[in-house]
Amino acid sequence: DPKPLKANAGKSFQGSIVLGMGFTFDDSGEADDDTPGIPSPIATMERLIAENPRNADVIFPYIGGKEVNDSPTHAHHRYVINFGDRSEEECRSGWPGLMAIVERKVKPGRMAQNREIRSRYWWRHGEICPALYSAVAADESALAVAQTSKYKAFTFLGKDFVYDQKLIVFPGGICSSFAVMQSTPHLEWAEFQGSSMKDDPVYTPSLCFDPYSFPTAFLDPKTTNPTHESALQSLEDIGKLYHEFRAELMVSNNEGLTS
């Protein structure tokens, strides 16, 4: 079996395992202010921010694979409370209104979790992924792909999202990265190496990304080798052209990546 390559370590991440839809604000389906396990209305979020602007510090746009694949502009429609790794005391004193929501709508489900750490820290996401968000913070955007989809289509997303667990995220999103990841060799490799869910292939980083042998120029973006510089620039130009054309086509046809 292919082995993970050191050059690829720490360059791909699964998004956050929020573990509780009660953390979210979403008007696209069932939502209310009381029922555990479902979102709150966005109007509730807006009211809480108006009452205490500091609440905006821990509410983030939330995006998953469906929005990335279905929206022509990868538009999100959800928001999520994210206290990071803050203590319960800090969250209660700093954001009492939001903590009340999480206690009412998330805690009951989390207390039933078999993993003790998830019930003990019920006000935090199930997996907060600090390495992912630290890596993304250094760049303007990140490359992402829906983990489970018949067609693998990579795209750029802003860095201010909370990424759902159904997204695989690659910090340092540049057009040369996009060109390599969207290329036929990589897509065929991922389909062959990856796992599956029902009839859809699953992009599993440990199987699809970590063992993949990327072009030398791609691995050394600060190269001073003229041949590698030329190859990297070609990848950058091709990736930019393809991504821009695809983005314009999706908007003009009002179609998503896989619709």
Regions inferred by a protein language model and the residue ranges of each:
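S-adenosyl-L-methionine
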Residues: 1-259
